[in-house]
Amino acid sequence: MALPFAIFAIGCARPDEAAATTAVEQQSPLATCTVTRISDGDSFDCGSTGRVRLLMVDAPELAQGKEGRLAKAALERLAPRGTVVGIETDVRPKDDYERTLEYAYLPDGRMLNEEMARAGLVTALVYPPNVKHSARIRGAVRDAQEKKRGLWATSFFDCEPRDYRAGRCGGGRPRPRR
């Protein structure tokens, strides 16, 4: 169901975190922010919110090669600078790097996290307690895998982003925790 753009301008109250995902909930007003810069395929800077990390998805790192660059380019196309997005927080609002963890909604109501997953440009990354939309995101990733979209189009993609960051494959270096 498309969420009309006008809903984003109504207010900035967040939906009840404990409520199930329903059409009624999706029509609830969301907080909004304006995209100012795309960092990579799963993070962007957003007005006064600061760095936003898309929940439940993990894009290849830019240093991983073309896959990382493709994911960033796709996010730039979906939510270019100046796009006002609706944002929804799950249980844990920040990650270990102090990025705001959010589900982001495009002006037409599509969930940005899910769109990146459905395009096959990210893997699913579940970190409890943030699991509100896990079935939805995992389903989109599974659909992309079955239809061989994005990362799944060839057998070349063999290093999950989290493994790359940990230095377990592809020449990545472990990233220090803060």
Write out the residue ranges for each language-model feature.
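Small beta-barrel nucleic-acid-binding modules, primarily SNase/OB-fold domains
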Residues: 1-178
